[in-house]
């Protein structure tokens, strides 16, 4: 946003960012279904913002099931530590991204060190998310690649 504002300011010096209304950005804590949110956060700052949102009264202290994975070059331990206060457990979601390696065993190690319950994401998990009958709130959190892969699978499971 800052870069776009700087470019717009060059083209029209009368532009004032303070006059910009509230933004609704796709993939930023976006509610997909009654029990499913997606956030394209991939760093500690994004994780802290999400933790703050899910700490609010509207969620009544309910903990999330985090659908997560991260690229190897990210500080996933800091991300997970920031999210720990609002998550019950983690489902490790695997996807392919050409030329980028996922954190793999190092994410498992970080989760163990942080004492966060976790396991691999399974097809039955997508059914649970889709059916929304188990009372859980799910948050798919990670890169644009994770969000895209997860949402494709989610919508395909719904026949969309």
Where are these regions (language model features)?
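Generic C-terminal helix-cap and adjacent flexible tail
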Residues: 59, 152-160
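Nucleotide phosphate-binding/pyrophosphate-handling subdomain across enzymes
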Residues: 1-89
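C-terminal helical cap/extension that packs against the catalytic core
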Residues: 80-137
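Short glycine-/acidic-enriched loop or helix-start segments at secondary-structure transitions
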Residues: 47-48, 76-78, 101-102, 149-152
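Short hydrophobic segments within beta-strands
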Residues: 67-69, 93, 141
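Short glycine-rich anion-binding loops that position phosphate/pyrophosphate groups of nucleotides
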Residues: 42-43, 72-73, 96-97, 144-146
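A glycine-rich beta-strand to alpha-helix segment
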Residues: 125-155
């Amino acid at each position: 946003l800052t870069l776009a504002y700087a470019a717009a300011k060059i083209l029209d010096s009368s532009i004032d960012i303070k006059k910009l209304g509230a933004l609704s950005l796709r993939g930023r804590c976006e509610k997909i279904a009654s029990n499913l949110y997606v956030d394209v956060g991939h760093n500690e700052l994004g994780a802290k913002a999400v933790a703050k949102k899910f700490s609010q009264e509207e969620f009544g202290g309910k903990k999330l099931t985090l659908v997560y994975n991260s690229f190897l070059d990210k500080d996933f331990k800091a991300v997970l530590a920031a999210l720990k206060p609002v998550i019950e457990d983690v489902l490790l979601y695997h996807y392919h991204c050409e030329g980028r390696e996922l954190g793999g065993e190092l994410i498992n190690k970080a989760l163990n060190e942080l004492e966060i319950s976790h396991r691999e994401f399974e097809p039955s998990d997508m059914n649970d998310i889709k059916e929304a009958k188990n009372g859980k709130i799910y948050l798919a959190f990670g890169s644009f690649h994770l969000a895209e892969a997860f949402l494709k699978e989610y919508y395909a499971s719904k026949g969309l």
